[in-house]
């Protein structure tokens, strides 16, 4: 999928641009964290296995000693 300024972005803002999770488009999202998971950009830190949850990314839970992001 192509990527253009102001287009779809990653994480809760919209689908990822590019193959897998390539660069994000649009003002609502920052850089993707590649195959690790979606990102939040200005909303907060990256979600998914790459990093902690931000306010727009749902909640953090601990399971079996590992933290992970949960959907809203």
Swiss-Prot record:
Matching Pfam families: MSSP
InterPro entries: MSSP
Record keywords: Developmental protein, Differentiation, Repeat, Spermatogenesis
A GO biological-process term: spermatogenesis
Nuclease found in the keyword field: no
Tissue: Testis.
Domains (record comment): This protein is mostly composed of repetitive C-G-P motifs.
Family: Belongs to the MST(3)CGP family.
UniProt protein name: Male-specific sperm protein Mst84Dd
Gene label: Mst84Dd
